Amino acid sequence: MNPCNTLFIFLRRTRWLAFCLLLGSVCAVTAQNITQTLTLNPGWNSVFLEVSPPNPAVGLVFSDPSISSVWEPVVRVTTVSFIQNQNEVPFNRGGWAVYVPTNRPESINNNLFSVRPNHAYLVNVSGTQPVQLTLTGQPSVRQLAFEPDAFTLRGFPVDPASPPTFQQFFASSPAHYNAGSGALQRIYRLKNTSSQWEAVSPGDHLNRNEAYWVYTSGSSSFDGPVSVTPSVGDSLNFGATADEKELTLMNSTAHPLAITISGFGAANLPLAYYAVPTNSLLRSWIPFSGNYTLNVPGGATQRLRFGIQRGQMTNDNFGAVLSVSDGAGSVRYVSVLAQRPAPVVGKSGLARGTHQPLDGGGTGIPVE
């Protein structure tokens, strides 16, 4: 028997309900997380965080003793001179939030205390050996705005199996690419061996986990050819009462894209999606078999409805991750969470709150 289930039953029997609910969330916590691995070379590294660690304290996330400092820009950067040489000391320290290990005297000036997903950091590594960091946390698909008419330090959800070129990736973003002239806005990547920022060419490829100085003309929150937006918050969180959640997919390119949604590292998820089955003209709830591909026309937005099948949940708390690949060089990860509602005993002594099939007027989404 699942140890989480065993403890849950024991605690429920002893009526420690509040503690039991807390324990249940801990048992399920790893299922909706992903792991991000960062390889840091000696010298300066420009990295992009995709996950939200359970404890975001910068000293815990970047705890390797070879890491000598972590920096995040906090001012509006409009000139290349601000970012030109990473080895200048101090390099515009007033424009940065900084962390150094607390065993060093200069840590008294620390003003960077926690990390955030979808944010970029410069990390300085001392010594001669690379450092590998393994970060586990909930992924984020929240779009962040670029600084208008300025540089922003930013990374992107690159598919490492088929990384796009900068021109391919930004072609559908007028703030970063001029389709008329074919000119890409200024973008710089950090060359680790020299600690120098170098301009990228349109045909260069992006890397996952790497952050770049990107100039944005006007306002933009572009993060790829396809944006992925949950109906509420940063995940598909059904809680204990919601039965449906939407995932909005917007194709900003001029051509259709086949977008594939897959269960990441898991199969037989208790989910259904609302679509037109093969050999049918009517939409209906279809069990999610682990993969679903839909074609989104160029410039179009599609909303995909997901339903939770609580009757198929093997625990009172469910967590999983969906990957969303646009086939154009980017992939995102979306957490899925759900709970079974606690039964409510009515005056008759019968438990209430049992979910019924959707077409039966109840609140569940079983499709059988």
Task: Please annotate each region the language model reported.
Residues 180-190, 300, 311-345:
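Terminal connector regions
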Residues 2-18:
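Bacterial N-terminal signal peptides that target proteins for export
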Residues 28-54, 345-368:
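Boundary/junction segments of secreted and surface-exposed precursor proteins
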Residues 16-26:
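Bacterial N-terminal signal peptides
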